[in-house]
Amino acid sequence: MNLYIPKLGTKIVLTKDWSFTLIAEGRNKTLWDLLSSTPLPVRPWGIPFNRYNRPKLHRTLRKGSVLKFDRIYIRKEQGQHDSVTFKAEVRHTGVWYKVRFWVKLEDANNIEFERVN
């Protein structure tokens, strides 16, 4: 196995279906609203940000989906915040939608892909 850290803007195509956890958070709104039957939940008034247990969806993007690296966030001793943000065009009910979403680094590390030139 070779270490691969992509440049931002790099595109990859999924070579296998990829399952991941989508967390209810504003930056995931476009994909959440597309893949969920309910709108993105809002943190209830009075609950501190760090105590709010955000709802999650377990979803799968299909083989052949193209993802573009938009942001990679990794901080020393802050592993709970490590994440990768993608831009993608997702087909849903026969229509293509442009979305931007982030996933935890652990989920991103499970992607099987090929680089797009």
Regions found by a protein language model. Give the residues of each.
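SH3-family beta-barrel domains
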Residues: 1-52, 114-117
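Solvent-exposed loop and beta-edge segments used for protein-protein assembly and interaction
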Residues: 6-8, 61-63, 80
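Hydrophobic beta-strand residues in large extracellular and virion-surface proteins
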Residues: 12, 67-69, 86-88, 113
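A structural detector for beta-sheet-dominated domains
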Residues: 15, 23, 70, 89-91, ...
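A short, sequence-level motif marking secondary-structure junctions
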Residues: 27, 71-73, 103-109
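Conserved beta-strand/loop element in small beta-rich adapter and peptidoglycan-binding domains
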Residues: 52-73
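Short aromatic-glycine-enriched beta-strand elements
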Residues: 74-89
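Intrinsically disordered, low-complexity, charged/polar segments
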Residues: 90-117
